[in-house]
């Protein structure tokens, strides 16, 4: 169900990150090297989740793996125990909570009209649902973390803190961001561009759906303009 996916991606997954932040406070900050295996696993997990996104044909599964990949960066940033790392982790958790929940809403909006979640069968929706295409574009750009979004702020802080801790991590982070951009653009092009494959009449978008998307993206944009509210 869509409500369960939204709550799981936006709240419950982030509660795990919050729990790690609280637990890390009881460990000495000078023993970061002890957590090196966990940092490597977190970054490697982010890469694997991103690569898994590239081979997904199910729209909902793609968004779910996207949430997992972002949490890999969050865990790595928390474990190194630096102020920038914690600030970046908090920023990315909040921003991606809004973004992933909005993506699940859009996936459900598409499913209600096409009755399928297969990417290749949902193409061409920009011809019939142009306003929904606008929401898809904005949400995917947020997922890619374009400036000046909160996602960009969080990823920039995480990249800076991890690079300062170990310069080699910039290779993994750069690869992760490249794959994220690839599957986000693939998701947008697969669902919106191309000829429409549906022969039946498509129901137009409703005001409640636009309101739901507005309630996701407007708070995210407001926080992006004033990030000191959360970090």
From Swiss-Prot:
InterPro entries: NADH_UbQ_OxRdtase (IPR003918), ND/Mrp_TM (IPR001750). It is found in: Mitochondrion membrane. One of its GO terms (molecular function) is ubiquinone binding. The keyword Nucleus does not apply. Its EC number is 7.1.1.2. It is a multi-pass membrane protein. Signal peptide: none annotated. The keyword Mitochondrion applies. Keywords: Electron transport, Membrane, Mitochondrion, NAD, Respiratory chain, Translocase, Transmembrane, Transmembrane helix, Transport, Ubiquinone. GO terms for cellular component: mitochondrial membrane. The chain crosses the membrane at residues 1-21, 34-54, 63-85, 89-111, 124-146, 169-189. Its main location: mitochondrion. It is an enzyme of class 7 (translocase). Pfam families: Proton_antipo_M. It catalyses: a ubiquinone + NADH + 5 H(+)(in) = a ubiquinol + NAD(+) + 4 H(+)(out). GO terms for biological process: ATP synthesis coupled electron transport; electron transport coupled proton transport. Belongs to the complex I subunit 4 family. Core subunit of the mitochondrial membrane respiratory chain NADH dehydrogenase (Complex I) that is believed to belong to the minimal assembly required for catalysis. Complex I functions in the transfer of electrons from NADH to the respiratory chain. The immediate electron acceptor for the enzyme is believed to be ubiquinone. This is NADH-ubiquinone oxidoreductase chain 4. It comes from Crotalus lepidus (Banded rock rattlesnake).
């Amino acid at each position: 169900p869509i409500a369960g996916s939204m709550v799981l991606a936006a709240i419950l997954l982030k509660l795990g990150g919050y729990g790690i932040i609280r637990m890390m406070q009881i460990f000495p900050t000078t023993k970061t090297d002890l957590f090196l295996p966990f940092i490597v696993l977190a970054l490697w997990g982010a890469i694997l989740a991103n690569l898994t996104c590239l081979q997904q044909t199910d729209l909902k599964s793609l968004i779910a793996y996207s949430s997992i990949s972002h949490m890999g960066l969050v865990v790595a940033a928390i474990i190194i125990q630096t102020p920038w790392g914690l600030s970046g982790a908090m920023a990315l958790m909040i921003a991606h909570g809004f973004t992933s929940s909005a993506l699940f809403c859009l996936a459900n909006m598409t499913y209600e009209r096409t009755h399928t979640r297969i990417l290749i069968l949902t193409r061409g929706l920009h011809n019939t649902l142009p306003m929904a295409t606008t929401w898809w574009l904005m949400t995917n750009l947020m997922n890619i973390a374009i400036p000046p979004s909160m996602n960009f702020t969080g990823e920039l802080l995480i990249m800076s803190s991890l690079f300062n801790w170990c310069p080699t991590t910039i290779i993994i982070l750069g690869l992760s961001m490249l794959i994220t951009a690839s599957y986000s653009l693939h998701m947008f092009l697969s669902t919106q561009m191309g000829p429409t494959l549906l022969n039946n009449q498509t129901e137009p978008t409703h005001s409640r759906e636009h309101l739901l998307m507005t309630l996701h993206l407007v708070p995210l944009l407001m926080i992006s303009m004033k990030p000191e509210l959360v970090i």
